[in-house]
Design a protein with these regions (language model features):
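N-terminal leader/targeting and accessory segments in enzymes
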Residues: 1-83
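Phosphate-binding loop of NTP-binding sites
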Residues: 80-202
Length: 202
């Protein structure tokens, strides 16, 4: 990821990555994301006051009140977070067979069918989608069809550590647009269909 070191040192140690300012604490890197409703660059100073080690920004902010924080500027903080998260968790998606299913309709049904077939063939499958996360008898709910990149990479690591050899996921158009799947190298891609539901203006 091309970047500019605005201040501080590239040798700054980071223990974890956050994009929710409420989780700010010493030793963390806070990625400032421009969302649809809020721009988390607004919370950079608050996070610095709480002791975060690194700020990742995509547009200039006033740094006068945070001289001790390492600040890195990138073109897209969402894209940067996706690659940073992959590196943080050891790029687990590269150590499993990755299958992505995208399209306007049919993603959930298709992923469940693929999961059933693969498991019948003896594969250990972790699945992420509209109905949540499934792996080896575990299930947990998700807020989005395609979770944020940090949660995705963390989940892939959980799959791998649990013994999964295959990761199967629904890839939403929003997930693609918002760089949630950036840095993931899919072995197999499945395209179901395209309808006006997913064709926006322009």
């Amino acid at each position: 990821v091309p970047f500019t070191l605005v201040q501080g040192s590239l040798d700054t140690e980071v223990q974890d990555i956050i994009y929710d300012s409420r989780k700010a604490a010493p030793g963390l890197a806070f990625v400032c994301i421009v969302g649809t409703q809020r721009d988390s660059h607004e919370f950079a100073a608050d996070c610095a006051a709480k002791g975060v080690s690194v700020l990742v920004i995509q547009h200039d902010i006033d740094l006068s009140a945070m001289p001790g924080v390492t600040v890195v500027k990138v073109e897209s903080s969402r894209y940067a977070m996706a690659l940073m998260s992959g590196n943080l968790f050891g790029n687990p998606s590269r150590q499993m067979t990755m299958i992505g299913v995208t399209g306007t309709k049919g993603k959930t049904t298709t992923t469940h069918m693929i999961k059933s077939v693969l498991e019948a063939a003896g594969r250990k499958v972790g699945m992420i989608g509209t109905n949540g996360i499934y792996f080896l008898g575990h299930h947990q709910e998700t807020a989005n069809t395609t979770p944020e990149s940090y949660e995705l990479q963390k989940t892939f690591r959980e799959f791998l550590d649990a013994g999964c050899d295959t990761a199967l996921m629904e890839v939403s158009s929003q997930g693609i647009m918002m760089d949630r799947v950036a840095g993931i190298h899919y072995d197999i891609g499945v395209f179901t269909n395209l309808s006006p539901d997913h064709i926006g203006p322009g």
